[in-house]
Amino acid sequence: MTWNMLLALLPLLVLFGGSITVLFLSERRALLSAAMCAVVAAGFAWWPASLEAAGTPLVASNLFARGCLTLWALLGAATCLLSDRYRGSRKLAAREYAALTLFAVLGMAILSASTSLVSLFLGLESMTLAFYVLIAVDRENPTGAEAGLKYLLPGFLASALLAFGIALVYAATGTFELSAAISLSMAGAPMPSIALLGWTLIMAAAAFKASLAPFHLWTPDVYQGASAPIAGFLASGSKGAVFAVLLGSAPLALIVPLRPLLGGLAALSMIWGTLAALRQTNLKRMLAYSSVVHMGYLVLAVLSNRSAGMEAGLFYLLTYSAATVGTFGLLASMVDSGGEPQDYAALEGLAGRSPWRAVLLTGLLLSLAGFPPLAGFMGKFVLFGAALQSGYVGLVVLALLSSLISCYYYLRPVLYLFRVRQGAPTVPAFNNCERLIFVLCAGVTLVAGLYPGPFFRWFGAMLP
């Protein structure tokens, strides 16, 4: 291994070393140390010497890979900071929790930087294995173990599909390199059946990890059973990493026979997720089904023109992640010995008890719904515009209808926030870590909606 390759891997090595080191720290320091480690890894990704480093045969070291690593590291740091309240009230195994969070970030970074089918498998499975445990790690939560099992069992099937698909693609093309495998698969006319089957299985595995319908059935139960910070991390980072590799080094939309299947997954996700979210009274289950809809929107970025779709997709990932982490973080900030607020009724009268929580939650939910001038509106505007320019008129019309209907299920909990409720229990004050995260989430949601230009220039420069 050359010095340049070592520099390219430095952020990943920091994450790996940090995940081991925090196991030897005290419970009180583990979460904060893990958050600092994630931020340091993000900093090393932009270290001048690292910027000049070449990639390795398995992972890239371009601006796209470094930008994605920065986002995953910041999401991991936010998860650790938002989980600090659980350490005292929920008897959280903080050291193991912190180590697994860093390991999940490491898997996401490897996945989004993958240039080989081997690193794609390693990154995806590293991330998934960490989440298996993180979902069930809260010993005070009786539904956590059940949620972990519901994520584990279908995950085994998805991993088997992915491994079998990779084997078929290698048999058809003779290479593990992603770009070469896609090019060789498309070289024949028609595409060899074994290659098409292999890519279809890989796409099915990715659809499970991103909870695209009909591979989403695990999502509502897992979100409900997992702690709020982990549910937010799963909804943003885990799914975001899958779409990052689909937008970057593994653009499955270039394989023409897969485009109708991707379009079908997008349409089914928007329809199924919207209809299911309408019936929910549990906030975390509603957010789970709405995330299925948002993943359907992101498929439009994968299908769209390469450069426009990537810019729109990355911007949407950023704005969706900020709103999602902030929303789940607000639920986590209200946790007590009795657990997290679950049903809409638990939010009743929150505006009178904690006005800032109510205002923040309202703004983040409105951004997810796509209300201007918040970032969610701008994200949908550019995403739907890119898909429309690429000729996907039917999918864009369906996305617009789905977005319009989503206003109902996003506004329902908002109405509960501002109802008057006598004798409602008090909620704890924000701690310093929570204040920092909520200011950042609210800032991104507002600034990216009002001044999106700098973000698009940054994402345009990141295109591989």
Curated annotation (Swiss-Prot):
Known catalytic reactions: a quinone + NADH + 5 H(+)(in) = a quinol + NAD(+) + 4 H(+)(out)
Stored InterPro entries: NADH-Q_OxRdtase_suN/2, ND/Mrp_TM
Keywords annotated in UniProt: Cell inner membrane, Cell membrane, Membrane, NAD, Quinone, Translocase, Transmembrane, Transmembrane helix, Transport, Ubiquinone
Enzyme class: translocase
EC number per UniProt: 7.1.1.-
Subcellular localization: Cell inner membrane
Keyword NAD among UniProt keywords: yes
GO biological process annotation, one example: ATP synthesis coupled electron transport
GO CC entries: plasma membrane
Transport listed as a keyword: yes
Pfam families: Proton_antipo_M (PF00361)
Transmembrane annotation, as ranges: 5-25, 31-51, 63-83, 96-116, 117-137, 152-172, 188-208, 242-262, 286-303, 312-332, 358-378, 393-415, 436-456
Membrane topology according to the record: Multi-pass membrane protein
Single GO term (MF): NADH:ubiquinone reductase (non-electrogenic) activity
Function, as annotated: NDH-1 shuttles electrons from NADH, via FMN and iron-sulfur (Fe-S) centers, to quinones in the respiratory chain. The immediate electron acceptor for the enzyme in this species is believed to be ubiquinone. Couples the redox reaction to proton translocation (for every two electrons transferred, four hydrogen ions are translocated across the cytoplasmic membrane), and thus conserves the redox energy in a proton gradient.
Family: Belongs to the complex I subunit 2 family.
Subunit structure: NDH-1 is composed of 14 different subunits. Subunits NuoA, H, J, K, L, M, N constitute the membrane sector of the complex.
Protein name as catalogued: NADH-quinone oxidoreductase subunit N
Species, as recorded: Syntrophotalea carbinolica (strain DSM 2380 / NBRC 103641 / GraBd1)
Taxonomic lineage: Bacteria, Pseudomonadati, Thermodesulfobacteriota, Desulfuromonadia, Desulfuromonadales
Gene: nuoN
